[in-house]
Amino acid sequence: MAPRQANGRSIAVSEGGGGKTMTMTTMRKEVHFRGVRKRPWGRYAAEIRDPGKKTRVWLGTFDTAEEAARAYDTAAREFRGSKAKTNFPLPGESTTVNDGGENDSYVNRTTVTTAREMTRQRFPFACHRERKVVGGYASAGFFFDPSRAASLRAELSRVCPVRFDPVNIELSIGIRETVKVEPRRELNLDLNLAPPVVDV
């Protein structure tokens, strides 16, 4: 008999000899992120509600749940500022993690390695198309503010250092050439007439 699923567990039922034998194995449960939905074909969609317009803002479709969660976090900080509920802390932010033991007063404070750094290591040159969203440009869910362009460029050069020297291209504008332009023949595109005869 085929396996069935019940409450996140896989149950295999086999009938043999005198009765039924049931084997239960726990399946690995996926982590669910705020603002992220898994598509049936395996990719992850990210969206957020705009608090001002009370509408959904589409942030994009991503290969991993962590990338989609990062897009949601960036949009949440853009919309709600420091009060935003996010999936991951900002780099350098410490998080409170409960050890899960009997003593709930014990709290272990650690700095969490963010998924953004792991994504940068795996895909340092990943490029995404830009989309115009609300107040700025969104590149795969990350908003672009022209006033912060210099600091973003400095951070990008630190994270993804350029391995080649830039090349200056100079255009020679001072040279003038005479171009002979002949007038084009007028096209007669009246469909009621026979096609024009072209002289070769």
UniProtKB/Swiss-Prot annotation:
GO MF annotation terms: DNA-binding transcription factor activity; transcription cis-regulatory region binding
Location within or outside the cell: Nucleus
Motif (EAR-like (transcriptional repression)): 189-195
A GO-annotated cellular component: nucleus
One Pfam family, short name: AP2
An example Gene Ontology biological process: ethylene-activated signaling pathway
InterPro entries per UniProt: AP2/ERF_dom, AP2/ERF_dom_sf, DNA-bd_dom_sf
UniProt DNA-binding residue ranges: 32-89
Ranges for region Disordered: 1-22, 84-104
Notes on the domains: Contains a slightly degenerated ERF-associated amphiphilic repression (EAR) motif, which may be involved in the activity of transcriptional repression.
Protein name per UniProt: Ethylene-responsive transcription factor 9
UniProt organism field: Arabidopsis thaliana (Mouse-ear cress)
Name of the gene encoding the protein in the UniProt record: ERF9
